[in-house]
UniProtKB/Swiss-Prot annotation:
PANTHER family: UDP-N-ACETYLENOLPYRUVOYLGLUCOSAMINE REDUCTASE. Pfam families: FAD_binding_4, MurB_C. GO terms for cellular component: cytosol. This is UDP-N-acetylenolpyruvoylglucosamine reductase. Cell wall formation. It is an enzyme of class 1 (oxidoreductase). The active site is at R176, S226 (proton donor), E296. Keywords: Cell cycle, Cell division, Cell shape, Cell wall biogenesis/degradation, Cytoplasm, FAD, Flavoprotein, NADP, Oxidoreductase, Peptidoglycan synthesis. It comes from Staphylococcus aureus (strain JH9).
Length: 307
């Protein structure tokens, strides 16, 4: 049963049309899985995020943040408390050699804006399906580039609802890691310092990376992107492939036959299917090679109640 006090309090903080109750989250994830959120809100201003976070902190209400749901699995039991979608914080502004983008802006779009202004440095992101907030959260990268190579600062909100501006060094960006994760912060916007380049050369590089991505990744099915982090000295996909796991299926989810590092939803798969397949792959690779595969994809939410 939804708490009316929380609903009424949220109505005082943000417009009513930005509040959804008992909202199905599978609408907002690339895997097309997930239960319902007690409250799902879509702020369009930084101040609205701050106000809701501050209220939630003062009243001990859990808060979960969502970008575009590309590298996340939400369990069928859903998420209690307040889910804040950051997708409407999607501004992209250019000033000289810098780009400032809102948390909800797609990093693909930001890389395209950089190209349009003949700014080089974000070509690596032309095929990453995440939002800016998610990209900073996990220091997203591809094809030899990553967020930490070009980010200047990130404007964040802490658990108490206060604004914090963090420099590149303060963000502690590492392989798929950052201070954002450790301190439970949320990114509102990020600034990137780029370099002047030639638009034709930037476009050529983006075309090459796009072709490589499309030829190797199973983009025809819903998926959560790259499932595992790269183990030191190895490639997760190669270990999975050498374990003869490509095509292995649990429920409606299977290890992609096109790229072993991906798991695709081929037949109405559930978050439970994903989670079980992830555990099976981890167990098999550990037994065969003695190597632990750590998840890159986030798994959140409550397990479904047994009927």
């Amino acid at each position: 049963m939804i708490n009316k006090d929380i609903y009424q309090a949220l109505q005082q903080l943000i417009p009513n049309e930005k509040i959804k109750v008992d909202e199905p989250l599978k609408r907002y994830t690339y895997t097309k899985t997930g239960g319902n959120a007690d409250f799902y809100i879509t702020p369009t201003k930084n101040e609205e995020v701050q106000a809701v976070v501050k209220y939630a902190y003062q009243n001990e209400i859990p808060v979960t943040y969502l970008g575009n749901g590309s590298n996340i699995i939400i369990r069928e039991g859903g998420i209690r408390g307040i889910v804040i979608s950051l997708l409407s914080l999607d501004h992209i502004d250019v000033s000289d050699d810098a780009i400032i983008a809102g948390s909800g802006a797609a990093i693909i779009d930001v890389s395209r804006v950089a190209r349009d202004y003949a700014l080089t440095g974000l070509e690596f992101a032309c095929g990453i399906p995440g939002s800016i907030g998610g990209a900073v959260y996990m220091n997203a990268g591809a094809y030899g580039g990553e967020v930490k190579d070009c980010i200047d600062y990130a404007l964040c909100v802490n658990e108490q609802g206060s604004l914090i501006k963090l420099t590149t060094k303060e963000l502690e960006l590492d392989y798929r890691n950052s201070i954002i994760q450790k301190e439970h912060l949320v990114v509102l916007e990020a600034a990137f310092t780029l370099a002047p380049g030639k638009m034709t050369e930037i476009q050529a590089k983006m075309d090459d990376l796009t072709e490589r991505r499309e030829s190797k990744q199973p983009l025809e099915y819903p998926s959560c992107g790259s499932v595992f982090q790269r183990p030191p000295g190895h490639f997760a996909g190669k270990l999975i492939q050498d374990s003869n796991l490509q095509g292995h299926r649990i429920g409606g989810v299977e290890v992609s036959t096109k790229h072993a590092g991906f798991m695709v939803n081929v037949d109405n798969g559930t978050a439970t299917d994903y989670e079980n397949l992830i555990h099976y792959v981890q167990k098999t690779v550990k037994e065969k090679f003695g190597i632990e595969l750590n998840r890159e994809v986030r798994i959140i939410g409550e397990h479904p109640k047994e009927s």
